């Protein structure tokens, strides 16, 4: 079998075998899933050094369209394959401990393997039609996957909403593919080069952009992600919305914006506006959430804004920053969802108001969560800072080239990072640093099957920040150089680039050492500690009642003048395109309902009118045919 097929075929077959293994047989599914993911990862690593690589076979003929099973390995797809399969392997290992008896392991592991297989197929597809098929397969798998959640009502609602919104975007993508075939006569991505200079090409690009942005989760096509988070199994959120969908959505957006289409300032501005609105809007929603999974889902949306903003600038360093942020987001967002799953596994809840004081009981989970929180907030020296810094630098360069409104987008990006950090202060305090409720006195650290993937991802957050030159030169620079002809190899280097991560890390370490010394001296000083006066009652009786969580820190933000209107509109689902579409649909439904009066003669009249219209259309077509002859 050609090596390019292994990341697709092996997980697909392993998933089928997992589905066929009887439920009463223990351990076989886990071994099959782990082996399938590991094989796919090894093959992906081997493929990275072999691009460009092609595989083409005749498939099916549809009229004048000869559909081929056309795969093409380029640098972008090669590096995305590695991280798609790496995350798949980590989540599989994690699930071996997280999964409980109440879940159907047959379907769970089968869906996980099939999701990775479909992802690899989409990344490797050179044919737009083949990409669309794998794209739709992943949508169906997500629908089935979310339905596996233990909260049946929330899972069903989230799955339905995800399927409708992603199905709509898939339809837009299908229409774009059809329009490309009609006018340009090719579906090969490597052969297409479309200048966006008229309404036709503009609408084709916008349709493909909608498909990419919905998959990635950018506003206003984002609400399926928080809906899925309410009921989906936590590892599913770590695998698909946090990792796979970000890889695929931004991969397609970058391919159409940098390779397939040549877009002008208008569409670039549209991308930048979408990016800035997504950054600020989603992080404002994250601030007021009380469920950890829903909070993380809004942050998953917010981070997409940096990727879209970077690509939209058209500046090489910002494009590189957007793509690098895609990679970084896959790492730390997966880690955050796995951390949430670890908390959920040990405490039975993800409600931040019911948590507290877990740092001593779950030290590994606390440390990796803190690393991921600092990374997503853009705090140096972690990986999230480097990619955000590159986007900021690109925006400043855009201003130097004469774009006077650059500061609006720069402020939005910086403001988003500040609010992200504020949000995770709440998470860390409420979950780990606050007072532990008595109901959580039994909590212990998760098993090594769950902590190992989290530790690996936390280390990547550090390595890709401190030694950012390596991933940028190895993964990102060839993509940008191939697309715009400019190298970004020197932007992060020792003393020679815009940002010196190693030197900054040294300064941070020195600061931490000085702080530790000051803290140590403080330990030796004597201080008087008194009991809190609570009206003479016994403290033990009211300890849980006096449990103050971090969520209260941001309780007043809803009433602040700049944000009050935003939150009111959000509660009314003004920004939920699914809800808005439903309201518009209800108007048509009510109009049609008025025609269904229950009177038989009225129904017969409608049938006669419809039949007459059909007969008229057929006779008109026949008459035109006869006249033409």
Over which residues does each language-model region extend?
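Transmembrane helix-loop-helix hairpins at membrane boundaries of multipass inner-membrane proteins
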Residues: 1-6, 16-110, 185-196, 477, ...
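Hydrophobic alpha-helical membrane-insertion segments
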Residues: 34-48, 169-175, 369-380, 453-473, ...
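Membrane-helix interface motif
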Residues: 49-58, 179-187, 379-396, 466-487, ...
């Amino acid at each position: 079998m050609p090596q390019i097929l292994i990341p697709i075929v092996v997980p697909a077959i392993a998933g089928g075998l997992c589905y066929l293994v009887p439920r009463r047989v223990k351990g076989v599914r886990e071994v099959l899933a782990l082996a399938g993911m590991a094989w796919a990862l090894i093959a992906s690593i081997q493929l990275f050094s072999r691009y460009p690589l092609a595989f083409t076979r005749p498939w099916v003929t549809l009229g004048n369209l000869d559909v081929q099973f056309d795969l093409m390995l380029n640098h972008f797809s090669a590096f995305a394959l590695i991280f798609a399969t790496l995350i798949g392997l980590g989540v599989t290992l994690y699930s071996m401990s997280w999964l409980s008896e109440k879940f159907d392991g047959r379907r769970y592991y089968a869906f996980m393997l099939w999701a990775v297989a479909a992802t690899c197929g989409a990344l490797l597809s050179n044919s737009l039609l083949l990409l669309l098929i794998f794209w739709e397969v992943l949508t169906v798998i997500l629908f089935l996957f979310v339905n596996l959640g233990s909260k049946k009502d929330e899972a069903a609602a989230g799955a339905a909403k995800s399927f409708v919104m992603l199905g709509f975007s898939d339809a837009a993508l299908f229409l774009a593919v059809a329009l490309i075939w009609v006018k340009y006569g090719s579906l090969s991505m490597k052969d297409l080069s479309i200048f966006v200079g008229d309404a036709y090409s503009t609408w084709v690009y916008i349709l493909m952009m909608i498909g990419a942005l919905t998959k990635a989760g950018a506003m206003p096509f984002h609400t399926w992600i928080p809906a899925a988070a309410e009921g989906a199994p936590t590892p599913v959120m770590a695998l698909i919305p946090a990792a796979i969908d970000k890889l695929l959505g931004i991969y397609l957006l970058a391919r159409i914006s940098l390779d397939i289409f040549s877009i002008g300032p208008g569409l670039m501005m549209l991308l930048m506006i979408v990016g800035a609105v997504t950054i600020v809007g989603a992080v404002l929603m994250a601030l007021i959430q009380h469920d950890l999974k829903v909070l993380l889902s809004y942050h998953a949306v917010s981070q997409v804004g940096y990727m879209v903003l970077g690509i939209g600038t058209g500046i090489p360093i910002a494009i590189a920053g957007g793509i690098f942020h895609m990679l970084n987001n896959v790492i730390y967002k997966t880690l955050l969802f796995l951390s949430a799953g670890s908390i959920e596994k040990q405490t039975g809840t993800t409600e931040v108001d019911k948590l507290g004081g877990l740092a001593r009981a779950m030290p590994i989970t606390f440390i990796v969560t803190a690393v991921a929180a600092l990374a997503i907030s853009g705090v140096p020296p972690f990986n999230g800072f480097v990619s955000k810094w590159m986007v900021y630098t690109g925006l400043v360069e855009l201003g130097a080239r004469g774009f006077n409104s650059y500061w609006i987008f720069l402020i939005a990006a910086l403001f988003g990072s500040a609010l992200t950090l504020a949000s995770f202060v709440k998470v860390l305090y409420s979950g780990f640093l606050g007072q532990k409720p008595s109901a959580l006195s039994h909590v212990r650290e998760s098993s090594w099957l769950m902590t190992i993937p989290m530790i690996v991802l936390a280390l990547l957050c550090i390595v890709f920040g401190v030694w950012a030159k390596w991933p940028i030169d190895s993964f990102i620079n060839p993509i940008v150089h191939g697309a715009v002809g400019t190298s970004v190899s020197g932007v992060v280097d020792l003393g020679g680039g815009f940002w010196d991560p190693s030197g900054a890390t040294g300064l941070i370490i020195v600061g931490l050492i000085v702080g530790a010394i000051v803290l140590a001296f403080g330990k030796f000083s004597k201080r008087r500690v008194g009991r809190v006066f609570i009206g003479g009652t016994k403290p033990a009786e009211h300890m849980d009642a006096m449990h103050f969580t971090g969520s209260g820190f941001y309780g007043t933000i809803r009433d602040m003048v700049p944000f009050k209107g935003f939150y009111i509109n959000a509660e009314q689902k003004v920004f939920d395109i699914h809800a808005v579409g439903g309201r518009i649909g209800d108007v048509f439904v009510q109009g049609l309902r008025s025609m269904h009066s229950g009177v038989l003669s009225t129904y017969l009249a409608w049938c006669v009118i419809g039949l007459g219209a059909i007969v008229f259309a057929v006779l008109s077509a026949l008459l035109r045919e006869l006249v033409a002859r």
